[in-house]
């Protein structure tokens, strides 16, 4: 129920945990991205006790060549090297260049119409959003598959992402891997499933 608008139907079902026991929706907000409206909610989830699971724990190494290598032998590829994302990245570069030319023409007083400029800007935004969604979906599926094995604990390295971003040769590749998003979502999923998450420094013996 949105103030001044009333009840609004959401396109996707099941994303907001309205029927899960112990889950409490605390607040919400509506935003617009690439001409689409999105709702974000803050949800309080119950503290599930860490289970005394007889299964072994696993370790996860995140990287640039491969996205994640799990100690159980499973490897998750770097999706940014897939043909699909490479094609979309090339499209994005072309559309960004076209947008830059339209801005330059506008500054020079040439006949670029503002409507055409906004149209091209929306194309760039939509492509950015599409690429982000593909990466986020891959992270969600990777985490779901890892957690599904029901390890007693999961160990990951406390990556210095800020330090890695300072390397101009690696910054773009690091940003596209979304390591922080992976860690944040993994923490939430482990908490939900009662799995202990161990975040260790790079010198931790494993």
Predicted features and spans:
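Positively charged, helix-rich recognition surfaces that bind polyanionic ligands
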Residues: 20-21, 33-206
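Acidic carboxylate diad motif detector
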Residues: 1-33
